[in-house]
């Protein structure tokens, strides 16, 4: 009642202070001392204050939660004003200067938003649990520092949005357009990104352990120093992408197309690679130790000083690749058989057939010296 009377005098600053005081008193009460009826009345008072504030268009107190086409709120649980619970009530927030809506620092649980225009909206610092955004336009939406748990973006436009420094667990981006999006320093554990466009997006130093990337188009994407350990990448198109210093330890890479991309000093240790096609890419100083490569091509790529120790190779093609200073050893049981990089330079194709059955190598130059041929023959004879 005091808050409402203060509103009538347009003394909004005192109202804000009063609400904060009410919240502190409410939080300090022992749970056993609050009956359901008292709890309901307290919530009703907060709602009355919020609705009155909304009529005054004072967005310092109210927050727009979900505005549908009929201008009605459709949400089950919302935390508003320092996480005070509001159940099944309408709280409408005015639009921001850019035409979006301000959800910042709200705790939103179980919301379902479909076919809405949320472009230029602000979710900075939000906590989103079991939230679903479907068929929404979220162009230039700000999720900076948001916390997301089991969130789903389905067929949404996320272009030019900001996901920097978010904390996402078990989130999904399905059939989305996420071009020019900032994901730098984002934590996206066990994220599932599929059928999505990531053109020009920035994942600088993003932590993406156990991520599943499937059918993703990612030209000019920046993954510099990102961590994708234990992740699975399948049917990915990287063109002019930067994957330098990326940690792909114990990851699975299948059907990957890398064209004119950078993988300088990238970690591919203990990684399984199948049908990875690298054309004209810079893979200098890449670490393939303990990796398993099957049907991979490194055509016209730079592998200078790359490491392939304790590595299994099956039908791997180094056609016109630069391999100076490359360190290679082939696994045979528990023994490693070294291959001199100078020998590899003389060959256009290395291991044309399965190492376990093929005992010869195609000669690409008639003048391969006898020493190189003897080393190659010995390796192939005893290769695993």
Model regions and ranges:
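Amphipathic alpha-helical elements of HEAT/ARM-like alpha-solenoid repeat scaffolds that form extended
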Residues: 18-22
């Amino acid at each position: 009642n005091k808050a409402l009377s203060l509103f009538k005098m347009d003394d909004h600053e005192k109202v804000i202070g009063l609400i904060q005081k009410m919240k502190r008193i409410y939080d300090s009460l022992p749970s056993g001392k609050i009956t359901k009826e008292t709890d309901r009345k307290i919530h009703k008072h907060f709602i009355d204050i919020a609705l009155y504030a909304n009529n005054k268009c004072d967005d310092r107190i109210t927050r727009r939660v979900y505005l549908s086409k009929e201008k009605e709120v459709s949400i089950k649980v919302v935390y508003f004003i320092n996480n005070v619970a509001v159940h099944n009530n309408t709280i409408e927030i005015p639009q921001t200067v850019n035409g979006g809506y301000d959800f910042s620092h709200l705790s939103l649980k179980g919301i379902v938003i479909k076919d809405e225009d949320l472009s230029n909206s602000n979710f900075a610092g939000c906590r989103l649990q079991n939230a679903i955004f479907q068929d929404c336009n979220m162009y230039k939406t700000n999720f900076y520092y948001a916390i997301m748990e089991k969130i789903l973006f389905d067929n949404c436009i996320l272009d030019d949005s900001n996901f920097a420094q978010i904390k996402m667990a078990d989130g999904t981006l399905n059939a989305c357009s996420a071009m020019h999006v900032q994901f730098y320093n984002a934590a996206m554990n066990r994220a599932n990104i599929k059928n999505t466009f990531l053109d020009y997006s920035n994942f600088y130093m993003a932590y993406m352990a156990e991520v599943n990337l499937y059918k993703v188009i990612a030209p000019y994407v920046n993954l510099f120093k990102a961590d994708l350990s234990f992740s699975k990448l399948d049917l990915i198109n990287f063109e002019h992408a930067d994957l330098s210093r990326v940690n792909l330890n114990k990851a699975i890479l299948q059907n990957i197309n890398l064209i004119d991309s950078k993988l300088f000093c990238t970690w591919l240790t203990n990684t399984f690679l199948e049908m990875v096609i690298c054309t004209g890419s810079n893979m200098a100083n890449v670490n393939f130790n303990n990796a398993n490569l099957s049907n991979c091509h490194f055509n016209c790529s730079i592998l200078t000083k790359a490491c392939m120790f304790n590595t299994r190779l099956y039908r791997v093609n180094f056609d016109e690749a630069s391999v100076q200073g490359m360190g290679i050893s082939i696994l045979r049981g528990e023994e490693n058989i070294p291959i001199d990089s100078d020998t590899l330079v003389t060959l256009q194709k290395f291991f044309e057939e399965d190492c376990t059955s093929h005992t010869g190598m195609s000669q690409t130059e008639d003048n391969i010296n006898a020493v190189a041929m003897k080393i190659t023959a010995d390796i192939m004879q005893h290769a695993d």
